């Protein structure tokens, strides 16, 4: 694995990434590449890199797992911004870098995203036609999630609060950084936060199971307005022409990945090859790293990429 900083000539800050190489890597050859996109609140050292990225590299792909702008080891100020348009642009920036590498076949580039990263991967493929195949692992439409649960079903109230907070910050006030999860499983239980997705997210992000320094699960509240008006799947019926695989778990939770997966699969009517992989025994967060869940997903994902990028 090689750690890099991507900063193309038209970028104001760098994107931190890890390149994972296939076995017996030979710089004189060309390889298909996968851009691996992390979830909302995550980082490249978690599921996008150390689970799916690692597995795909072992199967012959060159994988670039990276930190989103404003997050992890990537640049951008202020920190902890979740900006969907920037998240999608980050994918193109990483592709810009990948196509300069002599050992990457620019005609065989795919994207895989997990959770919010799955929604971003699909959205990027709508207009970024250098992407030849896209896989969403328990993908979430982050705009829909913010509009509903993350705003407590009061989006106008939250937007007004964001407006007030941003004005305070513009006048020199302290930034409001929201923690998105309970501090521990005990804290989740103490506050009655035992809904499947919330509790399993806490188990992943707040325990040694998945915890990493870059996976902050934080958000700058005042800069999240655009997220509430963003739709990962807009124009899918017209623009998503590339092969797409949507992997979902049928153990449903409040974050809505199962619902979003069925929606985008149904709307991907012009895709050259749309596939839905619905796994009955697994939940959203089990698909992050649980060996049985990941194995079942990869049994479909790897042949899919082999078909379209091989």
PLM ranges: what are they?
Residues 1-29:
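N-terminal cap/lid segment of alpha/beta-hydrolase-fold proteins
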Residues 41-54, 68:
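The serine-hydrolase catalytic nucleophile loop
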Residues 122-204:
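Alpha/beta-hydrolase-fold enzymes
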Residues 239, 246-248:
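Short beta-strand/loop motif that positions the catalytic acidic residue
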Residues 253-261:
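Conserved alpha/beta-hydrolase "acid-adjacent" motif
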């Amino acid at each position: 694995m090689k750690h890099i900083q991507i900063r193309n000539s038209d970028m104001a800050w760098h994107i931190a990434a890890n390149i994972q190489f296939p076995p017996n890597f030979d710089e004189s050859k060309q390889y298909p590449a996968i851009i691996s996109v992390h979830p909302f609140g995550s980082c490249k050292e978690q599921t996008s890199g150390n689970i799916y990225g690692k597995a795909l590299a072992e199967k012959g792909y060159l994988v670039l797992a990276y930190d989103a702008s404003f997050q992890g080891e990537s640049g951008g100020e202020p920190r902890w911004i979740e900006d969907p348009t920037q998240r999608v642009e980050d994918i193109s920036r990483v592709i810009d870098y990948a196509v300069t590498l002599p050992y990457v076949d620019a005609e065989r580039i795919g994207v895989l995203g997990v959770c919010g990263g799955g929604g971003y991967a699909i959205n990027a493929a709508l207009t970024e036609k250098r992407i030849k195949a896209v896989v969403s692992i328990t993908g979430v439409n982050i705009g829909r999630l913010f509009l509903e649960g993350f705003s407590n079903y009061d989006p106008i109230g939250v937007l007004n609060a964001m407006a007030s907070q941003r004005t305070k910050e513009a006048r020199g006030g302290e930034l409001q950084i929201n923690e998105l999860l309970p501090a521990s499983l005990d804290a989740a239980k103490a506050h009655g936060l035992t809904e499947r997705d919330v509790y399993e997210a806490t188990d992943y992000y707040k325990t040694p199971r998945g915890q990493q320094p870059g996976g902050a699960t934080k958000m700058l509240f005042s800069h999240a307005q655009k997220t509430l008006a963003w739709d990962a799947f807009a124009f899918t019926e017209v623009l998503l022409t590339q092969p797409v695989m949507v992997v979902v778990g049928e153990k449903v939770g409040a974050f809505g990945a199962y619902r979003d997966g069925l929606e985008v699969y149904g709307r991907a009517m012009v895709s050259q090859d749309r596939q839905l992989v619905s796994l009955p025994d697994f939940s959203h967060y089990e698909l992050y790293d649980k060996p049985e869940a990941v194995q079942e997903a990869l049994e479909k994902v790897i042949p899919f990429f082999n078909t379209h990028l091989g």
